[in-house]
Amino acid sequence: MSPGTVRVGCSGWQYRDWRGVLYPEGLGQARWLGRYAEVFDTVEVNSTFYRLASRDAVERWVLQTPPDFLFALKASRYLIHMRKLRDIGPGIERFAERIEPLARTPKMGPVLWQLPE
């Protein structure tokens, strides 16, 4: 068995409290992901649980991170909690369409399904 790779990251990068700690004062919010990716090699995108990301935003994620960076996306709560995993084909298609700029790269990691209790 070959050794695995351990990655360290956080659930998101858009935290104002990180100004002056991770993000230098004066660094615009549009550059936070790039700075985050200088320190960590993976991130969980929690926002996709609450709303679909735009294709433009996903393209920016890809461009702002180094080649070996990895994204873990949360599946939509609409599919999991509201639809209760029933008739979710169209929703999965919309999700896949939005994340396509990421999915076609090696930066695409797991899609996390936060199931209800």
Identify the residue ranges that each predicted region occupies:
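Residues lining hydrophobic/aromatic ligand-binding pockets adjacent to catalytic sites
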Residues: 1-117
